[in-house]
């Protein structure tokens, strides 16, 4: 059985640590800083870091890769179309990678960056900075249409899928969601819960796709109350869901 834990890094990053207790081998996702991973390995003698999975090239996701690879000899997986330090295996859409005995499907999810990928295994999604709890990543390289398509692809996964994104942005994202849908009871309830969690220093991840579909405005671009709110701000138009997404993302950027 694989255990998944979070190693906090920087101010709001999580490095996901996958642990196979039967073999004492582990893997990490997006180690932007080597120190938390090294500290865990030092505290768990006998464990071997065998694999490093990377979703995209931003420094807060790859900054610790080369140090960890040098120290452990771990195999580094990452998107083929981005410059990933120390990468051994270049991945593209629909590839499969075997980690700790689990097969992960690779999804190309451009938007935050053009080469961004996500890893999925039977109810587990490691999605980097594409889908957040109650939000989504900023568009540094891709277009709104690309990001909307990427989110739609992830939203089509089973609803009980656990969403392991890389940042603790849930509270601020829910405040925006409440502005978009002030009468959404699911958003209000989640905001109340997350507020208490953060006051007590409790992490809010992982999420589930079912919860995201109820409370994440970027997965609700076809909902009439969401389109009405966008029309209130931008004027009434016959908008496609991707255009609603673009308007929401632009609003969130200045929220």
Curated annotation (Swiss-Prot):
Gene Ontology BP term (one): methylglyoxal catabolic process to D-lactate via S-lactoyl-glutathione
Cofactor binding note: Binds 2 Zn(2+) ions per subunit.
SUPFAM superfamilies hit by this protein: Metallo-hydrolase/oxidoreductase
Keywords: Hydrolase, Metal-binding, Zinc
Family, as annotated: Belongs to the metallo-beta-lactamase superfamily. Glyoxalase II family.
Enzyme nomenclature, EC number: 3.1.2.6
Gene that this polypeptide is encoded by: gloB
Residues the entry annotates as binding Zn(2+) 1: 56, 58, 112, 129
Name listed for the protein in its UniProt record: Hydroxyacylglutathione hydrolase
Function summary: Thiolesterase that catalyzes the hydrolysis of S-D-lactoyl-glutathione to form glutathione and D-lactic acid.
Alphabetized NCBIfam families for the sequence: GSH_gloB
Keyword Metal-binding found: yes
Keyword match Zinc: yes
Enzyme category, top tier: hydrolase
Subunit (UniProt): Monomer.
Catalyzed reactions per annotation: an S-(2-hydroxyacyl)glutathione + H2O = a 2-hydroxy carboxylate + glutathione + H(+)
Molecular function per GO: hydroxyacylglutathione hydrolase activity; metal ion binding
Pathway entry: Secondary metabolite metabolism; methylglyoxal degradation; (R)-lactate from methylglyoxal: step 2/2
Entry cofactors: Zn(2+)
């Amino acid at each position: 059985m694989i255990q998944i834990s979070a190693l906090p890094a920087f101010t709001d990053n999580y490095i996901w640590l996958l642990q196979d207790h039967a073999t004492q081998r582990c893997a990490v996702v997006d180690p932007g800083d080597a120190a938390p991973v090294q500290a865990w390995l030092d505290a768990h003698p006998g464990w071997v870091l065998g694999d490093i999975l990377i979703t995209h090239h931003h420094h807060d996701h790859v900054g610790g890769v080369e140090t960890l690879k040098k120290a452990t000899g771990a195999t580094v997986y990452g998107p083929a179309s981005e410059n990933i330090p120390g990468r051994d295996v270049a991945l593209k859409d629909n590839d499969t990678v075997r980690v700790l005995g689990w097969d992960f499907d690779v999804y190309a999810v451009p938007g935050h960056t053009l080469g961004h990928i996500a890893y999925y295994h039977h109810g587990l999604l490691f999605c980097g900075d594409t889908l957040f709890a109650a939000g989504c990543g900023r568009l540094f390289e891709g277009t709104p249409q690309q990001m909307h398509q990427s989110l739609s692809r992830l939203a089509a996964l089973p609803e009980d899928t656990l969403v392991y994104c890389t940042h603790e942005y849930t509270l601020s994202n829910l405040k925006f969601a409440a502005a978009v849908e002030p009468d959404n009871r699911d958003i209000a309830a989640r905001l109340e819960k997350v507020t208490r969690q953060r006051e007590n220093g409790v992490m809010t991840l992982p999420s589930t796709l079912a919860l995201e579909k109820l409370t994440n405005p970027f997965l609700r671009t076809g909902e009439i109350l969401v389109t009405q709110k966008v029309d209130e701000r931008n004027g009434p138009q016959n908008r496609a869901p991707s255009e609603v997404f673009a308007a929401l993302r632009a609003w969130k950027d200045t929220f």
